[in-house]
C-alpha cells in the first residue's frame, strides 16, 4: 500500500483498541485511553467494499 518500507512501518506499526478504536504504540499491553487489554494490529489490507 505504501510506496516505500519506511512509510509502511510508520503507518502500520500500531495497535488498535477493539473497544474505543484508539491508536496505540506497538509495544502497548493495554489501551492508553480506556485501559482495555484487547488490542489488535492495524489492518494492512482494507476491509469491506
From Swiss-Prot:
Name of the featured protein: Large ribosomal subunit protein eL40
Family: Belongs to the eukaryotic ribosomal protein eL40 family.
Record organism: Methanopyrus kandleri (strain AV19 / DSM 6324 / JCM 9639 / NBRC 100938)
GO molecular function ontology, one term from the record: structural constituent of ribosome
NCBIfam families per the UniProt record, alphabetical: PRK04136.1 (NF003161)
SUPFAM superfamilies: Zn-binding ribosomal proteins
InterPro entries xref list: Ribosomal_eL40_arc (IPR023657), Ribosomal_eL40_dom (IPR001975), Ribosomal_eL40_sf (IPR038587), Ribosomal_zn-bd (IPR011332)
Gene name of the record: rpl40e
Record-level GO BP terms: translation
